[in-house]
């Protein structure tokens, strides 16, 4: 049985989120949480929250045993880009792009 958790619109670049997701793909849930706990990246904190949500969904909705769960799939997709303006010299302006992403986590036996 597979259970999902989706986090959308996270203020994180896809290029910074995917390497952290690769660290925990296919691992047991307790091992994945341990890896994310000691990974010093902003993405690790966000992905850990998504993984904890997927675990809670599996336990509450499906009655799954937490000790047997594994991270089946985890992927980070590109979201909308927030475009901002920064004033520059001589009346000019530059665009600042603030990327977002969507995180999809699936856990199962």
Swiss-Prot record:
Q: List the disulfide bonds.
A: none
One GO CC term on file: cytosolic large ribosomal subunit
A single MF term (Gene Ontology): structural constituent of ribosome
GO BP annotations of the record are: translation
Q: Output the InterPro entries linked to this UniProt entry.
A: Ribosomal_uL22, Ribosomal_uL22_bac/chlpt-type, Ribosomal_uL22_bac/org-type, Ribosomal_uL22_CS, Ribosomal_uL22_sf
What are the UniProt keywords, alphabetically? Ribonucleoprotein, Ribosomal protein, RNA-binding, rRNA-binding
Q: Which Gene3D superfamilies match?
A: Ribosomal protein L22/L17 (3.90.470.10)
User: What is one Pfam family matched by this protein?
Assistant: Ribosomal_L22
What this protein is reported to do is described as:
This protein binds specifically to 23S rRNA; its binding is stimulated by other ribosomal proteins, e.g. L4, L17, and L20. It is important during the early stages of 50S assembly. It makes multiple contacts with different domains of the 23S rRNA in the assembled 50S subunit and ribosome. The globular domain of the protein is located near the polypeptide exit tunnel on the outside of the subunit, while an extended beta-hairpin is found that lines the wall of the exit tunnel in the center of the 70S ribosome.
Which proteins does it associate with, and in what oligomeric form? Part of the 50S ribosomal subunit.
Q: Please report which protein family the annotation says this sequence is part of.
A: Belongs to the universal ribosomal protein uL22 family.
The entry's protein name is Large ribosomal subunit protein uL22
Q: Which organism is it from?
A: Methylibium petroleiphilum (strain ATCC BAA-1232 / LMG 22953 / PM1)
Taxonomically, what lineage is the organism? Bacteria, Pseudomonadati, Pseudomonadota, Betaproteobacteria, Burkholderiales
């Amino acid at each position: 049985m597979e259970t999902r958790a989706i986090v959308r619109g996270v203020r994180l670049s896809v290029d910074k989120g995917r390497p952290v997701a690769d660290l925990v793909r296919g691992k047991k849930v307790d091992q994945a949480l341990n890896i994310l706990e000691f990974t010093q990246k902003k993405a690790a904190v966000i992905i850990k929250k998504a993984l904890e949500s997927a675990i809670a969904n599996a336990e509450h909705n499906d009655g799954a045993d937490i000790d047997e769960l594994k991270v089946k799939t985890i992927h980070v997709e590109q979201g909308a880009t927030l475009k901002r303006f920064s004033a520059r010299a001589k009346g000019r302006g530059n665009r600042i792009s603030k990327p977002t992403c969507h995180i999809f986590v699936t856990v199962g036996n």
